[in-house]
Amino acid sequence: MNTIAKTTWLAFLLGFSALASAGHHEGVMHDGRDIKHIGYSQMGDPAAVLTVETEASHALRPGEVRVKVLASPINPSDLLQIAGKYGVDPVLPARPGSEGVGRVTEVSDDVKALSVGQLVLLASGNTWAEELVAPAAGFLPLPDLGPVGADVIEQLAMAAVNPLTALLMLTSYADVAEGQWIAQSVANSAVGGYVI
């Protein structure tokens, strides 16, 4: 695996572990607002088990940032996990969503890597929500793109899971050198498109 692939995969894993705990803030003071997220307490047909839930928004702890979720796609893997058919079962109750894009709205005083107004990729976990509060390491900063429209936001929301899957497939599971040919099935899938 090349250095870029290792770094990207490590950032993805760090984001997953940081965001996996997002929303669990026992003993942290309420900041006066309520936020909505999607949740489920049993696995099954997503149409039957998903609910819109409301919880208190919490004040930031050291090292945390608040991110307004701008878009989060519905991936087949999300639906399979909700249905209990993914191979890895979540701890229930759970919050779905494996990727997305958001804008930083608040940072704790000790966070220097992210700033208010910055666009970030939601690396993984709990992304079907209005906002996320989690350690800064759980978000991948994007460069300043200037003003962006909804079409760009929608594309950015899908920039973590499938591109990284394609990258890892080409760098970790095959020894493909520049100029070599590969054969691929399901080339019209999202992962297939990134491989091409």
Residue ranges and their predicted role:
Residues G15-S21:
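N-terminal signal peptide c-region/cleavage motif recognized by signal peptidases
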Residues A22-H30:
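Cleaved targeting-peptide boundary
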Residues A56-P73, A83-T127:
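Glycine-rich beta-strand-centered segment in the early N-terminal region that forms part
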Residues A160-I196:
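Mid-domain Rossmann-like dinucleotide-binding core that forms the NAD(H)/NADP(H) cofactor-binding site
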